[in-house]
A protein has these predicted regions:
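Active-site helix of classical SDR
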Residues: 154, 190
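Residue(s) in the substrate-gating loop at a strand-loop-helix junction
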Residues: 174
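Active-site loop immediately N-terminal to the catalytic Tyr-X3-Lys motif
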Residues: 132, 179-185
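Conserved glycine-rich cofactor-binding loop
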Residues: 53-54
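The beta1-alpha1 cofactor-binding region of Rossmann-like NAD(H)/NADP(H)-dependent oxidoreductases
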Residues: 95-105, 136
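Substrate-binding pocket helix/loop in short-chain dehydrogenase/reductase
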Residues: 130-131, 135-140
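SDR active-site lid
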Residues: 207-273
């Protein structure tokens, strides 16, 4: 049986594509391969990650790379990285989020590598201890890294996302950004700041087709000791000891790999959900606070500490 597959080109000339089923099959296969390669190219997405040398940042870089994403993993000293540098689809760049000039420089280098779809603001650490024992330098350093670093990296990428009317910012917040705990006032302050900032910014960014989300984990196993600074004072030794005991022996501690999976879900679920509370400990405490109210929650924390 004969077949005639034709179309008119832009000059309205009749173009014959195939006259037999064999010709049609050949033409269709060529077309499929062409568009399939284009589809694959377009579906290869890129994530830019800060604080990728350890913990959640590193686990997220590995998780996304294993999912076929291109990953731009940034850290203060990429020359010391011995694992991510072995992955073909991971590029390492230097970035200290407390250095505004380097933020601009690294952003430009990252954008020169190609299209970026997601920026994951993850760099941060915990400053724990009573306020009386914390120095002004420690306060400034905590705010510079946990809050201002996120703000500056976001500012650097907004024009790019705005121009293409697409893109997503994801920030590592904390359950300490929706609930406050003792002996962590400055850490709480940075995470609460991120929560208000993110919610307000979500209205602005939605006007230009850009999204923003926050990940709110509870205790994360790899970061309890590795990314925490302690400031102690003898007058508060009892409270500090009780609280640290709760942290060290707490149930429902989450791994960095589990958080990385939540980040991936946030990046790919196609929703405009703002907050992702994750980890059994965080989910339980947050549900308790919502159900019982602020004052009842505060009382429960005091009761746990025997205060």
């Amino acid at each position: 049986m004969a077949l005639c597959l034709t179309y008119f080109n832009k000059d309205y000339r009749l173009i014959i594509l195939a006259t037999t089923y064999s010709d049609f099959a050949t033409w269709y296969l060529q077309l499929y391969r062409r568009f399939d390669s284009i589809k694959i190219y377009k579906m290869t997405k890129t994530i830019f990650i800060t604080g990728a040398s350890a913990g959640i940042g590193k686990a997220t870089a590995i998780f996304f790379a294993n999912k076929g994403w291109k990953v731009i993993a940034t850290m203060r000293k990429p020359e010391n990285e011995k694992e991510l540098n072995l992955l073909d689809n991971v590029t390492l760049l230097p970035l200290d989020v407390t250095n505004p000039a380097q933020i601009k420089e690294t952003t430009q280098k990252a954008l020169a590598l190609g299209d970026i779809d997601v920026v994951f603001n993850n760099a941060g650490y915990a400053l724990l201890g009573v306020l009386e024992a914390i120095t002004d330098e420690q306060v400034v350093a905590q705010m510079e890294t946990n809050f201002l670093g996120v703000v500056r990296v976001t500012q650097a990428f907004i024009p790019y996302f705005r121009e293409k009317r697409a893109g997503l910012f994801i920030t590592t917040g904390s359950s300490a950004g929706v609930m406050a705990f003792p002996v962590s006032s400055m850490y709480n302050a940075t995470k609460w700041a991120l929560e208000g900032w993110s919610e307000s910014l979500s209205y602005e960014l939605s006007e230009v087709g850009v999204g923003i989300k926050t990940i709110e984990p509870g205790l994360v196993a790899t970061e309890i000791a590795d990314r925490t600074i302690f400031a102690t004072h003898p007058a508060y030794e009892s409270l500090t000891s009780k609280f640290m005991a709760l942290i060290e022996h707490g149930e429902g501690v989450t791994t960095a790999e589990q958080i990385a999976e939540v980040v991936y879900g946030a990046a790919t679920d196609g929703t405009d959900t703002l907050r992702y509370v994750c980890g059994e400990d965080a989910k339980g405490l947050y549900a308790q606070r919502l159900a019982n109210g602020d004052e009842a929650f505060r009382k429960s924390i005091k009761d746990m500490l025997g205060a």
